[in-house]
């Protein structure tokens, strides 16, 4: 029987979703992106070759897998055109494998200009966005003034609506931010170029996915960012502009929630965060520097260094609740190789009391101090191990403690960047 699996991040993004999605795509008929935009970077490593994707789903490197961009994604024509060009240069027939919802809002140059002007104006209070226009594009969607992929079917109407929208946004840029305005002609030219090249990829995504399910095809729903960047459930205001939690898989694709069968949550064996915002277990010492260096912790999209810290089980328990996590995938276990001691955050010290639940308020979370459980590390290398029993005893005890204190079983463990460097204890698709 066909099975629909959702893959989401349980931290602040960068957990390794791209690798897991790529690994599981040989079991599915389609991979669906359901939220976010080209602010997300998913890194795939196959036989040592690295591919970084931002909009195209991570199944694109597999033959016979349909890659679908759902309505919850805000789509930059220029970014998608560049990504498709890059893939085709590498011999990947991206257009043969890709479908796009007509309901995707477009991210256009004036969104980028607004995003960057705002961050500049905020100064030290900047959110730390990627500056790629994602927030302003989602704002236009909610304000019901967005231009969508499907609007390009009528070029005259699109041009007229674009002129009206740009009058508004250029007024804000010029008169509020004292920034340069954006050229209407250049934006229109870019949008029409996208239509000319890729309009054949546009399809009714909910009907397509329903058809695949009737045909008995497995589907994988690929989340972007992570649970605590969710606009509602994250560390607001240091969040992204979309719902990154599993519920968005339904609204961002058009699949009914009853048809989502299980949710795999991904977390690193430690924790990272890019940009501003509370991070209770952050390590600003030699151990944090070691994790960053060993884990090559630089953003795939922004190339900004990631902040590193110990795994936060208080946060992980909350992520499991708000996503209905069925099982966990632990990534970058090998990064912990060689450390003499490891720590797991099991509670917080807040307002002179011990707190076992993560506060949603960012100001409160900043004041939370981690309470750690110490465990022995291991000196052996775990890189490339594919059998659980081959892991060092201390590594197995570490994983078992994560299972015990999170309340969620671990089904998959990543021991390196390559697709093959993985331990699969239980397959989400039952294969």
Curated annotation (Swiss-Prot):
IMP binds at residues 14-17, 39-42, 130, 144, 225, 240, 304. GO terms for molecular function: adenylosuccinate synthase activity; GTP binding; magnesium ion binding. Belongs to the adenylosuccinate synthetase family. Pathway: Purine metabolism; AMP biosynthesis via de novo pathway; AMP from IMP: step 1/2. The keyword Transferase does not apply. Its cofactor is Mg(2+). Binds 1 Mg(2+) ion per subunit. It is found in: Cytoplasm. GTP binds at residues 13-19, 41-43, 306, 332-334, 414-416. Its EC number is 6.3.4.4. Mg(2+) binds at residues 14, 41. One of its GO terms (cellular component) is cytoplasm. The active site is at residues 14, 42. GO terms for biological process: 'de novo' AMP biosynthetic process; IMP metabolic process. The gene is purA. Gene3D superfamilies: Adenylosuccinate Synthetase, subunit A, domain 1 (3.40.440.10), Adenylosuccinate Synthetase, subunit A, domain 2 (1.10.300.10), Adenylosuccinate Synthetase, subunit A, domain 3 (3.90.170.10). This is Adenylosuccinate synthetase. CDD domains: AdSS. It is an enzyme of class 6 (ligase). Homodimer. Plays an important role in the de novo pathway of purine nucleotide biosynthesis. Catalyzes the first committed step in the biosynthesis of AMP from IMP. InterPro entries: Adenylosuccin_syn_GTP-bd, Adenylosuccin_syn_Lys_AS, Adenylosuccinate_synth_dom1, Adenylosuccinate_synth_dom2, Adenylosuccinate_synth_dom3, Adenylosuccinate_synthetase, P-loop_NTPase. The keyword Nucleotide-binding applies. Keywords: Cytoplasm, GTP-binding, Ligase, Magnesium, Metal-binding, Nucleotide-binding, Purine biosynthesis. Substrate binds at residues 300-306.
């Amino acid at each position: 029987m066909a099975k629909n699996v959702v893959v989401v991040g349980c931290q602040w993004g960068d957990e390794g979703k791209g690798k897991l999605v790529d690994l599981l795509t040989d079991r599915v008929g389609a991979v669906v992106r359901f939220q976010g935009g080209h602010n997300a970077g998913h890194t795939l490593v196959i036989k040592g070759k690295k591919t970084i994707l931002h909009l195209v789903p991570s199944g694109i490197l597999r033959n016979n897998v349909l890659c679908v961009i759902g309505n919850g994604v805000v789509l930059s024509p220029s970014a998608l055109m560049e990504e498709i060009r890059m893939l085709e240069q590498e011999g990947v027939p991206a257009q043969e494998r890709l479908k796009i919802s007509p309901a995707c809002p477009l991210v256009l140059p004036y969104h980028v200009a607004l995003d960057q002007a705002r961050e500049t104006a905020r100064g030290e209070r900047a959110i730390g966005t990627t500056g790629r226009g994602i927030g302003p594009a989602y704002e236009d969607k909610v304000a019901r003034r967005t231009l969508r992929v499907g609007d390009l079917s009528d070029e005259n109407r699109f041009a007229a609506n674009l002129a009206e929208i740009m009058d508004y946004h250029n007024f804000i840029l010029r008169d509020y931010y004292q920034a340069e305005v954006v050229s209407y002609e250049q934006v229109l030219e870019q949008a029409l170029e996208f239509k000319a090249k890729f309009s054949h990829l546009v399809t009714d995504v909910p009907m397509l996915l329903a058809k695949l399910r009737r045909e008995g095809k497995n589907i994988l729903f690929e989340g972007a960012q992570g649970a605590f960047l969710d606009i509602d459930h994250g560390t607001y205001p240091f969040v992204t502009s979309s719902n990154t939690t599993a519920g968005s898989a339904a609204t961002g694709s058009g699949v009914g929630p009853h048809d989502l069968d299980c949710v795999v949550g991904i977390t690193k064996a430690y924790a990272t965060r890019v940009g501003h915002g509370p991070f209770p277990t952050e390590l600003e010492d030699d151990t944090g520097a070691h994790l960053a260096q060993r884990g090559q912790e630089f953003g795939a999209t922004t190339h900004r260094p990631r902040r590193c810290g110990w795994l936060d089980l208080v946060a992980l328990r909350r992520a499991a609740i708000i996503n209905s996590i069925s099982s966990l995938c632990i990534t970058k276990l090998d990064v912990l190789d060689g450390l003499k001691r490891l720590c797991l955050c099991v509670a917080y010290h807040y307002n002179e009391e011990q707190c076992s639940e993560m506060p949603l308020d960012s100001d409160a979370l900043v004041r939370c101090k981690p309470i750690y459980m110490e465990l022995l590390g291991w000196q052996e290398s775990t890189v490339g191990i594919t059998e659980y029993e081959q892991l060092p005893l201390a590594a197995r005890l570490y994983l078992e403690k994560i299972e015990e204190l999170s309340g969620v079983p671990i089904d998959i463990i990543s021991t390196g960047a390559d697709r093959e460097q993985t331990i699969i204890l239980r397959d989400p698709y039952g294969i």
